[in-house]
């Protein structure tokens, strides 16, 4: 039986006054997914929604939830980031998947498609913009018949 998988998509810039709300909503969404049998959680390694999601998953796992955290990185050089939040996320991951060797515009779309293709549920932290990676990923997920849960900011 295929393990139930959930991924996140969302904006890198989350307004300061929305951070606590987004973190709380991500926690609720992840806990509901765990109760529904989800055990594998994938994040794309970007600032903002991805790292908040990863921190929530890592915290639940530390509390004893039998879940795994995966980073789907768009290109290998991303591993060289010195951002402390990124490095904390990487060290918490059970698996790291690198989608492309070199950085390019297309590697981000490759990463987003991988996450959706692997997932049954996509949690989207979305500000209503009609362009960009978040809306692309949401539309791709809907085209693939995946469940999309939106956290509006």
PLM features per residue range, with description:
Residues 1-153:
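Acidic/glycine-enriched connector segments
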């Amino acid at each position: 039986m295929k393990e139930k998988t959930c991924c996140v998509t969302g904006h890198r810039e989350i307004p300061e006054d929305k951070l606590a709300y987004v973190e709380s909503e991500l926690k609720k969404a992840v806990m509901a997914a765990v109760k529904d049998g989800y055990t594998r959680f994938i994040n794309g390694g970007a600032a903002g929604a991805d790292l908040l999601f990863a921190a929530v998953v890592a915290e639940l796992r530390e509390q004893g939830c039998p879940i795994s955290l995966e980073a789907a990185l768009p290109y290998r050089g991303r591993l060289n980031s010195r951002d402390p939040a990124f490095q904390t996320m990487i060290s918490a991951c059970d698996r790291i998947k690198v989608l492309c060797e070199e950085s390019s515009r297309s590697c981000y779309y490759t990463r987003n498609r991988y996450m959706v293709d692997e997932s049954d549920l996509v949690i989207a932290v979305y500000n209503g913009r009609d362009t960009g990676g978040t809306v692309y990923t949401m539309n791709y997920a809907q085209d693939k018949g995946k469940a999309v849960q939106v956290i509006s900011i």
